[in-house]
């Protein structure tokens, strides 16, 4: 079963823009993954703790949409007690588009602001129309993510 999981639109401040959708599904235990060496340059099957450790140490870089989607997947997996239960429970999840905005934090950091943040509409940019309310799975996620400023 394939479950539509999240929908992210690259913000205007990025030079390359995408309208990306993420899906969750089960794969056979002996499934082999491959990369195209263009958009994807590397792959690995890792446990949540290993990914978190690699991200914290700087050994692994991950785009904000991928990072947020993984955190949402992990949270749902824990909440539902396993993959099959998660996929069944989430098969009708509401998936609004998420178009982040950037807030300047200082000389060394930037903050990515998501549409359910109370200050989203005050930040100038081409943000998406906000909804009157967002699904609980999004509201459970932080509405801001900080990253070192790339030079």
Task: Please name every model-derived segment.
Residues 59-67:
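Generic detection of long, well-ordered alpha-helical segments
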Residues 7-10, 47, 76, 118:
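Intrinsic disorder/low-complexity segments enriched in polar/charged and small flexible residues
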Residues 13, 32-34, 121-123:
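Short helix/loop capping segments that flank catalytic or ligand/cofactor-binding pockets
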Residues 64, 71-73, 78-151:
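Core RNA-modification/binding signature centered on pseudouridine synthases
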Residues 1-31, 66-69, 90-101:
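Active-site segment of metal-dependent pyrophosphate-handling enzymes
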Residues 1-8, 20-27, 33-60:
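NUDIX/MutT-family hydrolases
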Residues 26, 45-48, 66-68, 134-137:
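Short, surface-exposed linear patches
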């Amino acid at each position: 079963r394939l479950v539509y999981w999240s929908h992210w639109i690259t913000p205007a401040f990025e030079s390359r823009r995408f309208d990306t959708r993420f899906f969750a599904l089960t794969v056979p235990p002996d499934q082999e993954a491959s990369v195209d060496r263009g958009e994807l340059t590397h792959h690995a099957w890792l446990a949540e703790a290993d990914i978190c450790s690699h991200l914290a140490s700087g050994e692994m870089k991950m785009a904000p949409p991928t990072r947020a989607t993984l955190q949402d997947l992990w949270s749902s997996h824990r909440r539902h007690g396993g993959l099959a239960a998660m996929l069944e429970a989430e098969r009708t999840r509401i998936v609004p588009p998420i178009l982040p905005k950037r807030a300047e934090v200082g000389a060394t950091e930037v903050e990515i602001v998501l549409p359910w943040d109370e200050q989203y509409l005050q930040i100038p940019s081409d943000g998406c129309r906000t909804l009157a309310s967002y699904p609980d799975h999004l509201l459970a996620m932080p509405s801001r993510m900080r990253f070192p400023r790339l030079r």
